[in-house]
Amino acid sequence: LPETLVPLTFSGNAGVTIPAGERLQSDAAAFPVEKGTAIAVSLYFAEFTEMRSGVVITGPLSGGYFAVGDQTANAVLDTDTSKKTHTVYFLSDIDVLTAAENRTLICFGDSITAQAWPDYLMERTLQCGDGTTAVIRKAASGTRILRQYDNITYDSYGLKGETRFPREIQVAGADTVLIQHGINDIIHPVGTDVNRFRPWSDLPTAAEMIEGLRFYIRTARASGLRVYMGTLLPIEGWRTYADIREKLRSEVNQWIRTTDEIDGCVDFDRAVCDPEHPTAFAAGYDSGDHLHPSLTAYARMAEEVPEALLRNEESH
């Protein structure tokens, strides 16, 4: 609605130049936020702007539009000159001044977390939580824990988790992080005879992956966060599936299920796998690529998160 449009400023200025690789925070804005309502943030680029980074978010609560011209003051877009998109540029956080008892749960991961389960978790929080918890997604498709690509072909996959994680958990009001990350470390390496940018030497051992997850734990603890981890999902049928990858996934999952170094395991794998054939998704839970879950499976993943995580309780 036109009456809800609030311009943002940066040190009092209507526009801002963001240095490459840097973060900027806008001035505070007087804008009422109601629990469970959507917020639209409009950006205008007066000149051609080459997008070198961004993230694709495809959950049901997420999305936006491209449009021609300066539409920032318009409450409605012309459907003939606009296009729906799931790509998010520049915006990483919206901080809200709220009551002290309110808290934030961070969902950290890759393309699986960039898709629907955090959205369904937010919906579940609104339905059965105590109204104090916000769910924040920190996800980048294609990312790995231990390595990142240094070539134009795969630069869009972004930074490795060991670089991303310390920065991305700096979220206002956060007290818990739920990590579901690591499957790309397992499925990406194929050998330089197949893909020059994906050597077999990139395939980690289970011990190396676990040490990467331990880095997450140490970093989160240093920021005062509780740490929950989700198991890695089935991959049988994915184009690079092999016994060596399944063995690695199984070993990492076994550690996640049994370690006493975290506050709890959310067993996403068992929630969506075929109980008769646990290396594959259960019927109706595969999106079709044998790597990403279906929307039904994402909803099931959200159900697997303990209800205690959706409430502000002293002990989870």
Residue ranges and their predicted role:
Residues 213-221:
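Surface-exposed amphipathic alpha-helices with a cationic face
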Residues 136-138, 228, 266:
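General small-molecule cofactor/ligand-binding pocket signal
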Residues 223-226:
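A short helix->loop->beta-strand "cap" motif at the edges of active sites that frequently abuts
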Residues 1-108, 113-114, 127-131, 310-316:
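N-terminal secretory targeting modules
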Residues 152-153, 187, 195, 232-316:
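Catalytic His-Asp segment of secreted/periplasmic serine-dependent ester chemistry enzymes
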Residues 170, 221, 257-258:
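Non-catalytic positions within long, well-ordered alpha-helices that form the structural scaffold/packing
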Residues 1-28, 94, 101-212, 238-241, ...:
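Conserved SGNH/GDSL esterase-like catalytic core that processes O-acyl groups on lipids
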Residues 181, 231-232:
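A cross-domain feature marking catalytic cores of carbohydrate-active enzymes
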